[in-house]
Amino acid sequence: MIVRSFKDIEGTDRHVKAASGTWESKRIVLAKEKVGFSLHETVLYAGTETSMWYANHIEAVLCVEGEAELTDDETGEKHWITPGTMYLLDGHERHTMRPKTDFRCVCVFNPPVTGREDHDENGVYPLLTEPEEV
């Protein structure tokens, strides 16, 4: 059993701040735990815009605080995301988030991330793996 608090994560390599300055994420469960998914708490900052494309991952997102406009960049369809709303990127959709307020969400990724990922110039997380233990 693993028990981990946000306090345990703050100030460690599990507390990731995007190079873009638009979000930060606490990586609660990672690939090295070998459970088949990763779990994060992410905050996207008010007034920012983040374009993403999880070409290598499926992501489920549950908003727990704040409000944001989610745009499907492939169709142009817009959705207003508020607390209690979930969206699932089951088709690797290119999308853009525009938070009106600080937007806090819980995210699940499959395959799991290692914790070292940040979006590249295309908004993609690279598919990183943990080295095999000898």
UniProtKB/Swiss-Prot annotation:
Pfam families assigned: Ectoine_synth (PF06339)
According to the UniProt entry, its GO molecular function terms are: ectoine synthase activity
Do the record's keywords include DNA-binding? no
Query: According to its UniProt record, which reaction does this protein catalyse?
Result: (2S)-4-acetamido-2-aminobutanoate = L-ectoine + H2O
Gene Ontology process terms (BP): ectoine biosynthetic process
Which InterPro entries does its entry note?
A: Ectoine_synth, RmlC-like_jellyroll, RmlC_Cupin_sf
Q: Which domain of life is it from?
A: Bacteria
Please give the CDD domains that the UniProt record associates with this protein. cupin_EctC
What Enzyme Commission number(s) does the record list for this chain?
4.2.1.108
- To which pathway does this protein belong? Amine and polyamine biosynthesis; ectoine biosynthesis; L-ectoine from L-aspartate 4-semialdehyde: step 3/3
Indicate the enzyme's highest-level EC class: lyase
Task: Specify whether Lyase is a keyword of the entry.
Answer: yes
Question: Which keywords does this chain's UniProt record carry?
Answer: Lyase
Instruction: Show the disulfide pairing.
Output: none
Functional note: Catalyzes the circularization of gamma-N-acetyl-alpha,gamma-diaminobutyric acid (ADABA) to ectoine (1,4,5,6-tetrahydro-2-methyl-4-pyrimidine carboxylic acid), which is an excellent osmoprotectant.
Q: Which NCBIfam families match?
A: PRK13290.1
User: What is stated as this protein's family in its record?
Assistant: Belongs to the ectoine synthase family.
Name of the protein in its database record: L-ectoine synthase
User: What is the native source organism of this protein?
Assistant: Streptomyces avermitilis (strain ATCC 31267 / DSM 46492 / JCM 5070 / NBRC 14893 / NCIMB 12804 / NRRL 8165 / MA-4680)
Source taxonomy: Bacteria, Bacillati, Actinomycetota, Actinomycetes, Kitasatosporales
